[in-house]
């Protein structure tokens, strides 16, 4: 199959007010060209709307009709992300006619993992048909629902792309990819046919929520608060006894499954230190679950910009930690690139999730296609 140009979109559960947009050329198996990437801010009005929507989603919790705010938020974010796609493509000297497909993940507002006797449920806001009409380009969307209807976790979906990246870099077995978004997820590949992926625990979401609750901004910028704080080791040890952390994979999390309340009663510095250490400790427990424990973690996502997080990963997870850029990847772009890659797989009828990554009963094609 000939590679085609595809655009990927991602807005994470951390709600940082930005749209990640990436352009790659791929056949859905290999990456032919890393085109370009941009981080484009939402207008404040949409950011506020999404925060209200997340609150409404948690109150709804898949019971009864969807909150009315979903429709309003869905249209607003679809229009904003469509504009971001056009701006990226035209800024790269191309037109939408050059783009084979857009991968539109949408905004996750609620994700409930399956339990024994109960299928999981997930809701991403994003109107693929509207985006198709705005861009006149095929749009792949709703990537997670089919996997969950079949009994899978619906997450993480990055495994196919992470594996393609590792294959291109000749990295396997002793190397794993860790993405630090709102939630942290890991992908391990044995270099042959075995790929394992799962959510390890929280990453930026509880830390950012805690910082916001203290009125100190949106995040622990440069890890300054966490670095200045002291970790309550007894409290951390108790938190690390959470059964999720030793539960066998496949497994997935909602961004609110581990919350800022873990640091209740602590000052800003000590709370940031505790939450950062918890993320690192949870990753360490995840590494112990893998078929072989990797010696190196290649880290992507926003959390890698936090030097305290990176240092704690090395010391508390007992692993060498390197930036995605050390392998020639763009660590900020990986998630958006992933959905461009998956969109091509949807377009070509290829699976996007697997029994060893989401627990689906067989490789799942997934995704819907508009256009």
UniProtKB/Swiss-Prot annotation:
Keywords assigned by UniProt, alphabetized: ATP-binding, Carbohydrate metabolism, Kinase, Nucleotide-binding, Transferase
EC top class named in words: transferase
EC number: 2.7.1.170
Gene Ontology molecular-function annotations: ATP binding; kinase activity; phosphotransferase activity, alcohol group as acceptor
InterPro entries tied to this protein: Anhydro_N_Ac-Mur_kinase (IPR005338), ATPase_NBD (IPR043129)
Gene3D superfamilies according to UniProt: 3.30.420.40
One protein family per Pfam: AnmK
Binding of ATP, residues: 12-20
Disulfide links within the chain: none
GO biological process annotation, one example: 1,6-anhydro-N-acetyl-beta-muramic acid catabolic process
Domain of life: Bacteria
Recorded metabolic or biological pathway in which this protein acts: Amino-sugar metabolism; 1,6-anhydro-N-acetylmuramate degradation; Cell wall biogenesis; peptidoglycan recycling
Catalytic activity: 1,6-anhydro-N-acetyl-beta-muramate + ATP + H2O = N-acetyl-D-muramate 6-phosphate + ADP + H(+)
Family: Belongs to the anhydro-N-acetylmuramic acid kinase family.
Function in brief: Catalyzes the specific phosphorylation of 1,6-anhydro-N-acetylmuramic acid (anhMurNAc) with the simultaneous cleavage of the 1,6-anhydro ring, generating MurNAc-6-P. Is required for the utilization of anhMurNAc either imported from the medium or derived from its own cell wall murein, and thus plays a role in cell wall recycling.
Protein name as catalogued: Anhydro-N-acetylmuramic acid kinase
Source organism: Mesorhizobium japonicum (strain LMG 29417 / CECT 9101 / MAFF 303099)
